[in-house]
Amino acid sequence: MSHQTGIRANEQLAKVLGKAKNGKLRVVKVSIENEQLSCSATADVKKDWERDYDKLLGPLLEETVPCYILYRLDAKIPLGHSWLLISWIPDTASIRQKMVYASTKATLKTEFGSAYITEELHATTLEETTLEGYRKHKRDFAAPAPLTTREEELKELRKTEVHTEISTNTRHQTLGGISCPLTDATVAAVQDLVRGNYDYLQFRIDLEEERIHVSHAAQVELSALPKQVPEDHARYHLFLFRHTHEGDYQESYVFVYSMPGYTCSVRERMMYSSCKAPFLEQLAALGVDVVKKLEIDNGNELTEAYLLDELHPKKILHRPAFAKPKGPPNRGAKRLTRPSNEDQV
């Protein structure tokens, strides 16, 4: 199945989306009906966004029926108000529904205007669609606050203490390489990926503190994947590749290690190379079953054909028979041998 479903907004939805940008609508519910994006319901602004959230959102969601929700926040951006896009795809939805809604979300963002959508939430349970669920999502993904000068001094002091404390935040050497600790934000992002909030994560190694940070988390179309790969720095990438193979729908985690040649420092190349295997073990411990590990030096390599070929190599159905080599030329006539007297006895 292609990554673009061909589904587009109908005329009614196009008018509603245009009206929504004037700031009077709080909620727009969008459903896929008859192979079209259509407006199922709207709600006007009543109070502030937090007090409107559960009151307006709850009645619009059906327990087993997926939909999109465009929710207007009160924060302002240069274009107008910022919007939250909620993808409500319950676990009970069919595989086809999950595929169609996942593949059509980018189209909805384009129809509405991606610049207006400043936040996204992927929900599979009704609890995740509540205001508290949204706040928890924000807390889980919030990056840790930078250390104060005093905290930095205490950190350095602990490094010089006589006893050594080994924990998940301690870098250590393993047989497979160097295990760098993950930041809290990195762990939260991976957990969100497993829950379905994202399908793409990018990681960087802070060479000074030797920790792995999440540098980007999003829902990314495969066609836009090559643009995520930096041309001047190494990175790790984790992508949920949704595809069909021999008629079966599959979701496969693909891990990509990108290293743009010798534009990176020697230390950067060594760190990314040494940390890769332990990092994959950490991902496995967090519930990520990586099906394929790839190494590239250019983002343009990440095409659908390339990933399919790596995940499902083409089988050779016909093997030509091994041809018996010919003997050397000019061997002369075949010699006849006379039987000996012993053979005649």
From Swiss-Prot:
Keywords assigned by UniProt, alphabetized: Actin-binding, Cytoplasm, Cytoskeleton, Repeat
InterPro entries to which the protein is assigned, alphabetical: ADF-H (IPR002108), ADF-H/Gelsolin-like_dom_sf (IPR029006), Twinfilin (IPR028458)
Cellular component terms per the entry's GO annotation: actin filament; cell cortex; cytoplasm; myofibril; plasma membrane
Residue stretches making up the ADF-H domain: 4-139, 177-312
Coiled coil: none
Keyword Signal recorded: no
Cell division recorded as keyword: no
Places the protein is found: Cytoplasm, Cytoskeleton; Cytoplasm, Cell cortex
Biological processes, Gene Ontology terms: actin filament depolymerization; barbed-end actin filament capping; positive regulation of neuron projection development; regulation of actin filament polymerization; regulation of lamellipodium assembly
Superkingdom in the source lineage: Eukaryota
GO molecular function: actin binding; actin filament binding; actin monomer binding
Stretch list, region Disordered: 320-345
Family: Belongs to the actin-binding proteins ADF family. Twinfilin subfamily.
Subunit structure: Interacts with G-actin; ADP-actin form.
Record's function text: Actin-binding protein involved in motile and morphological processes. Inhibits actin polymerization, likely by sequestering G-actin.
Protein name, entry field: Twinfilin
